[in-house]
Structure formats: structure tokens, C-alpha cells
Regions:
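Phosphate-handling catalytic cores of nucleic-acid transaction enzymes
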Residues: 1-206
Length: 206
């Protein structure tokens, strides 16, 4: 965020039983054991903002997105990309407006691709899920994965943190280099600015 001022939201969408929520659970397990994702439809905007604001340098999962979602929550989701959470008046502090910070990655999942708001759409990177039937071997390996997650994965996150300083030192350079490479690769093609920045933000990390 210090480099880009924005961070793409990972969208997992597909039919029920395709494994999208389980992937999100696996990813959040690296930071928060036994994380329970809020259902965006029956969770208040204030509670959603609190769920995002209470963690830093981790991942928050918001589940059950639908295109019928009310406009206020869609606006809230768009703000997450910009690093801004809920905005409110603090009546105990001279009625000053306060905006909660967003210092984490966000996963948004649901059965529908978010097409109701093009501005939200451009803030997302997508993983599509379509498979809903699985072999016995796939089910066995899934159960093994869940057992590993139950034992805890945060020790692996600790190992990754050993490379934090190297990542921070090199990311700015790699971001600029990746943006330049993409500009050449896609010359003559029209790519929405947010989409371009999403691609660069992720690719620069590798």
C-alpha cells in the first residue's frame, strides 16, 4: 500500500460446493486460525468495517456476495481497494469525520461475479470455480488439508516474515519495472487503469 495506494480485492466466485469458501479459509488460516467469514448480506456495514480494521498485514474474507447487494455496501467494498474503510462522525471528538484504515488484503466470495457495479468490478482480480463433483482421492486430500490447517499454519507465516525486509527493499523497483514491461506488452490495447494497476501490484511481487 505504501507503493501503490491501492490493493486489489481477490474475488472467488462459482456455484455452491465448488470450494471457493474453502480456499478463502485456507488462505486466512495463515494468519487467523478458525476464521469465520462474515456474510455480507446480513452483517452491518459497521461490523464489516470492524472486521477489516481489527487486523493488519493479514487477510480478511467476506462471504456471500450477490449483485443485489445494497449500494452502501458496494461503496464500502470499493473503498477497501483504496485503503479506506468506514467513514463516520466522531461525536466525542469535536464531531470530526473519521475513516477506518484498511491494512489487510481482502477476499470477496460468492456465487455471482460482481457485475452490478463496473467500478467495483475493476477493483477485483478473479478466480472462477466451476467444478462441484470430486473424486474419492480429491476428497481424501481435502480432508488431509483441513487437518493440517486445524493444527495451525501461522508458523509458516513466521517463516515468510524472514523475507519481509528484502521484499520491502525491492518492491518499489519491481513495481516500476513490471509496469514498464506491461506497458510495452500491451501497447495499442485499451486496459482500464485500475485493472492495469491490479495486475502490476500482484506480478511485481514475483
Amino acid at each position: 500500500m505504501n507503493v501503490t495506494t491501492s490493493f486489489p480485492i481477490l474475488n472467488l466466485f462459482g456455484p455452491k460446493g465448488s470450494g471457493k469458501s474453502e480456499l478463502a479459509h485456507s488462505l486466512t488460516s495463515f494468519f487467523i486460525p478458525s476464521y469465520i467469514a462474515p456474510n455480507i448480506n446480513n452483517t452491518t456495514k459497521a461490523a464489516l468495517a470492524e472486521a477489516v480494521a481489527e487486523v493488519s498485514n493479514a487477510i480478511v474474507h467476506i462471504d456471500e456476495y450477490k449483485n443485489t447487494l445494497d449500494i452502501e455496501k458496494r461503496e464500502f467494498l470499493k473503498g477497501l481497494w483504496d485503503g479506506a474503510g468506514r467513514s463516520r462522525m466522531n461525536m466525542d471528538n469535536d464531531k470530526k469525520r473519521e475513516t477506518t484504515a484498511v491494512d489487510c488484503g481482502v477476499i470477496l466470495s460468492g456465487q455471482e461475479m460482481p457485475t452490478a457495479d463496473i467500478a467495483l468490478f475493476s477493483r477485483l482480480v478473479f478466480l472462477t470455480f466451476s467444478k462441484t463433483t470430486f473424486s474419492d482421492d480429491e476428497k481424501r486430500r481435502y480432508n488431509e488439508l483441513k487437518l493440517i490447517e486445524k493444527r495451525g499454519l501461522t508458523h509458516l507465516t513466521g517463516e515468510l516474515l524472514k523475507h519481509r525486509n528484502q521484499f520491502r527493499s525491492n518492491y518499489r523497483h519491481m513495481y516500476d519495472e513490471t509496469a514498464a514491461d506491461f506497458s510495452v506488452a500491451f501497447v495499442g490495447k485499451i486496459i482500464e487503469d485500475r485493472t492495469f494497476r491490479n495486475w502490476v501490484s500482484i506480478t511485481a511481487a514475483f
